[in-house]
């Protein structure tokens, strides 16, 4: 718009990460790392309960102290949300703080219900996506207050609609959250995975997306090799243009033996893609997950595997990794990486899926 002054600037993810690390360092001057959970590059949770008496400050004064320190050392304006639990702190920042002059939102269970039970849209709330919002709207539920009322009148219906996720939906409708900072810090997954996902910049056709699926699998396999890991299965998730309101496609394929072999994994994942993806709907998101990854260890070949061919492929993988490490990720590519629909070269210049 002509009447608004603004700057058009390219995103610089590497710079953002450097500033994020600096700001985290500022927080460590006041709060121990055990009481901080980094949620994203620009957001973290802090349990400051035991620090209020130490610094002789109220919760709001503590937030202001941290915000002032960030401003003084980086020139960046911070925003804070204060809540009696993690969920309320998040909502206080996401919804309340942006409408307050000092950028500090505050909520407890009662004020949450008073201020936000009628708030719209529902997708403003943490963990409620547009699809969940549309699903609820189909039954006349448009606010958190509506969800709270439904939990009293027909809780079984919510569980039938959303399964185990209904428990979290109901808790959040009432402003409750059972997870504490200690739970986050003590949580360790029994199974580990490695994933590669991206949002496409336009609708991709079935064949164009097949090229991207092969590229992403190739990158995932080399990541496994570089880390000395193998997997026994891969999950593929495909999401479509939201205007078609089509459910995402999802499938998992298992390998006869744990593997990180490029040809085996690329061909198998492409076959899975061609089996589960809708060839007639524009594709916008792709995610590939290597499940139950474990350290590679000693590789024992079966009677049905060509050990010489496998060793040759492994030497090729290691050579590719060495070239990329020395000369850059785009120093060596497959021919398909030069296709117009390829995202390989652009993503190699990104950090965490964002422009570096």
Which ranges hold each PLM region?
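A glycine-rich phosphate-binding loop feature that marks nucleotide/adenosyl-phosphate handling sites
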Residues: 84-87, 171-174, 230-241, 283-294, ...
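Acidic, metal-coordinating catalytic segment for phosphate/diphosphate chemistry
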Residues: 250-251, 255-356
């Amino acid at each position: 718009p002509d009447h608004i002054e603004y700057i058009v600037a390219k995103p610089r993810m590497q710079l953002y990460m450097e500033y994020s690390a600096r700001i985290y360092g500022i927080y460590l001057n006041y709060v121990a790392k055990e009481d901080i959970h980094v949620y994203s590059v620009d957001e973290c949770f802090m349990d400051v309960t035991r620090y209020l008496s130490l610094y002789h400050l109220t919760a709001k004064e503590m937030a202001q102290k941290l915000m002032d320190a960030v401003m003084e050392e980086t020139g960046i304006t911070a925003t804070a949300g204060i809540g009696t639990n993690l969920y309320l702190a998040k909502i206080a920042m996401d919804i309340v703080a942006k409408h307050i002059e000092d950028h500090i939102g505050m909520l407890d269970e009662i004020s949450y219900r008073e201020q936000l039970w009628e708030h719209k849209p529902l997708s403003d709330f943490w963990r409620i996506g547009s699809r969940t919002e549309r699903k609820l709207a189909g039954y006349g539920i448009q606010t958190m207050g509506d969800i709270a009322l439904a939990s009293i009148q027909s809780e079984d219906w919510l569980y039938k609609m959303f399964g185990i996720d209904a428990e979290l939906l109901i808790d959040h409708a009432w402003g409750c959250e059972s997870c504490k900072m200690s739970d986050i810090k003590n949580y360790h997954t029994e199974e580990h995975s490695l994933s590669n996902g991206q949002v496409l910049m336009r609708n991709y056709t079935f064949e164009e997306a097949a090229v991207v699926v092969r590229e992403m699998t190739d990158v995932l396999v080399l990541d496994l090799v570089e880390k000395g890991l193998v997997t026994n299965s891969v999950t593929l998730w495909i999401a479509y243009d939201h205007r078609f309101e089509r459910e995402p496609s999802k499938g998992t394929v298992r390998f006869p033996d744990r593997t990180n072999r490029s040809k085996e994994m690329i061909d198998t994942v492409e076959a899975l893609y061609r089996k589960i993806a809708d060839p007639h709907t524009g594709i916008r998101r792709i995610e590939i997950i290597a499940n139950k990854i474990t350290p590679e260890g000693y590789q024992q070949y079966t009677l049905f595997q060509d050990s010489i061919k496998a060793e040759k492929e492994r030497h090729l993988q290691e050579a590719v990794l060495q070239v990329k490490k020395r000369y850059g990720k785009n120093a060596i590519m497959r021919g398909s990486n030069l296709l117009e629909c390829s995202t390989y070269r652009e993503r190699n210049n990104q950090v965490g899926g964002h422009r570096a």
